[in-house]
Curated annotation (Swiss-Prot):
Probably functions as a manganese efflux pump. Coiled coil: none annotated. It comes from Geobacter sp. (strain M21). GO terms for cellular component: plasma membrane. One of its GO terms (molecular function) is manganese ion transmembrane transporter activity. This is Putative manganese efflux pump MntP. Keywords: Cell inner membrane, Cell membrane, Ion transport, Manganese, Membrane, Transmembrane, Transmembrane helix, Transport.
Amino acid sequence: MDWLTILGISVALAMDAFAVALAAGAVISPITGRHLFRLGFHFGLFQALMPIGGWLLGMTVQRWISAYDHWIAFGLLVFVGGRMVHEAFEDDEDKTPSDPTKGMTMVMLSVATSIDAFAVGLSIAMLGVSVWLPATVIGLVAGVLTVAGMLMGRRLGEKWGKRVEICGGLVLCLIGLKILLEHTLLK
């Protein structure tokens, strides 16, 4: 697999992570280096590990995984996005915004944004190509674009406030819907 192909796949896979990071950056105030590291590291790590997992499992479970992966991603993204929209409408004095770079929220977002990378790993296995270089590049690109998305999201959050939090939640829901439609109606 040539470098241009690997880079193209990496950027395409990182787009969901970038969009989620944009939404996360809009709701975290102030964003610290810890936030950037946690989300960038975990999104990059999951994006790198999923193709390896797909490659290792190969064709043995492809039918089972492909039947449910889109539902898992849809459910996770709609849950987190819905919670963001709900929190945007809560009273400010009662509100302690949840940090999407911590705990189960971070894990759910990491899994949801990297499920497509698992399918790429299955494809790489079918090609008989080593997964190690593509997985490394996929992880690095996802990590860098996640940090860039958070920084851009912070600027939007400072300027537009709650509207960006609502939009961010809706974007997560729409990404989930897009994944679901791509794997069901548009197949």
